[in-house]
Amino acid sequence: MRSFIAATIAAAASATLMNGEDYAFIQYVAEHAKSYGTVEEFNFRKANFLAAHAEIAAFNSATQTIGHNVFSDWSADEFKKLLGYRAQDRIPSQSTFTPPKSNAAVVDWRSAGAVTPVKDQKACGSCWSFSTTGALEGAHFIASGELLSLSEQQLMDCSWKFGNLSCGGGLMDSAFNYAKTTPITTEAQYPYTAMFHTSCGYVAGTGKVQVSSYYDVTLNSAQALKDAIALGPVSVAIQANEPAFQYYTSGIITSGCGTSLDHGVLAVGYGSENGVEYTIVKNSWGPSWGESGYVRIGVAEGAGICGINSSASQPQTN
């Protein structure tokens, strides 16, 4: 059947008469090396793509661009399963902290060597675990000068009793609480599978980084988030279930997303462009998404653009 679909695509691509939408879909399939096993799936994916195509065409922003990416043939339900930040379960930490005011105009922890390469959570709602490991990787580097890629799968498999649900979602603060009790091992030692596991595979003695404490950044304060970022990468939650984020390709998001938090990411810096301030955010959808796996989100007081000021936390490590 795959050969039938391939032949169908090849025939369509060579046809002299093809409407613009059909041609756009064929180009998309080729560019993203998509493969559909049945005629029914082909038609389903095409319908999803055409819906995305309409949203992208209707989008208008002076500060950012959006375009087709790996998610353009996904259904809305499939995409929502990626968004695993369980805002309804969050209990604010008893420890809050207002960092000293930062006077630095630009901070970028990538250039300092504190950020690992962009990872890919795949079709699993494990964003919270990637946000957690990113914050721990940064804190450990700042404390020791050693950059380690830490295991998201350990957090997924082993922090159930702290309220996390693997691919079903979780919270960064809950993962920090787990990492107080058990050090986190490396990605190489405990590789990512993007799957539910009912048992914990952590091997005692292999842990590398343990949380000594963590704090929640002052709520709804753009300045407090900026000051925290100046100290190191910060786990943040945002609303990602909007075309402005799903199909983001470049620029600064200044509108088009709400504040209903559903996705855990990592703030790794800040700066400004043409007078527009932004936060540099590392996503976990692979390096082909956005600006090489990153997104710049505009700065605003209150909950912030995409809710970025609403649920930020930062760990310290042993």
Describe these PLM feature segments.
Residues 1-10:
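Classical eukaryotic N-terminal signal peptides for Sec-dependent ER targeting/secretion
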